Amino acid sequence: MNTSRFESLTGSVDVLFPEYDDPPSEPITLLKRWLATADVARVREPKALALATATSDGRISSRVIAFSSIDDRGVIFCTHSTSRKGRELTETGWASGLLYWRETGQQIMISGQAVPLEESENDKLWFGRSVPMHAMSSASHQSDELVDREALRAHAAELLALGVALPRPPRFVGYRLEPHEMEFWAASSDRLHRRLRYERDGNDWKTTQLQP
């Protein structure tokens, strides 16, 4: 029975998911496949990651960021080390992220250690950004109190007017979210949504199909 009309899901359902029954040996391969498919399906913001961090006493915060890239070890993103998420990552070293693609009815959960990148990698991230993005990232101290909005705007405008790449602020850093657990979720019209979980097992991965 098709019960999708009772759901709040507004995108496609029953997208192809052959890996559900024949999963790759590790999850990054599947993540890359899904991202490539999302591009073809014209998902509007495939890199919008809802990233949750926490303090050492368990107080959770979350925000949506755009991750930078994916390599064979995980998902790379950047932030200010002095921001709330930066401070919480320093406290615990762990984070959990969720990609939700309304257009295709898919979700990907990524949970694991957020490992700081080397300074050379931070530089590569910074100088890989378009020059106009440097101004506000240099002028702002992310998550600090905003005392004078116009002063910050003016400072960023002065930097932008220079028209050159700016030095990377030391507080601008990158992390790699290296998964210890990942889950791939695909909506189904019969509500038997397909959930495939990967769990780190030493140097290998264990896969499990989960009930919806």
From Swiss-Prot:
Primary enzyme class: oxidoreductase
Known catalytic reactions: (1R,6R)-1,4,5,5a,6,9-hexahydrophenazine-1,6-dicarboxylate + O2 = (1R,10aS)-1,4,10,10a-tetrahydrophenazine-1,6-dicarboxylate + H2O2; (1R,10aS)-1,4,10,10a-tetrahydrophenazine-1,6-dicarboxylate + O2 = (5aS)-5,5a-dihydrophenazine-1,6-dicarboxylate + H2O2; (1R,10aS)-1,4,10,10a-tetrahydrophenazine-1-carboxylate + O2 = (10aS)-10,10a-dihydrophenazine-1-carboxylate + H2O2; (1R)-1,4,5,10-tetrahydrophenazine-1-carboxylate + O2 = (10aS)-10,10a-dihydrophenazine-1-carboxylate + H2O2
Cofactor binding note: Binds 1 FMN per subunit.
InterPro entries to which the protein is assigned, alphabetical: Phenazine_biosynth_oxidase (IPR053451), Pyridox_Oxase (IPR000659), Pyridox_Oxase_N (IPR011576), Pyridoxamine_oxidase_dimer_C (IPR019576), Split_barrel_FMN-bd (IPR012349)
MF (Gene Ontology): FMN binding; pyridoxamine phosphate oxidase activity
UniProt keyword tRNA processing, yes or no: no
Keywords carried by this UniProt record: Antibiotic biosynthesis, Flavoprotein, FMN, Oxidoreductase, Virulence
UniProt: substrate binding residues: S8, H80, R129, S137
EC number: 1.10.3.16
Name listed for the protein in its UniProt record: Dihydrophenazinedicarboxylate synthase
Species: Burkholderia lata (strain ATCC 17760 / DSM 23089 / LMG 22485 / NCIMB 9086 / R18194 / 383)
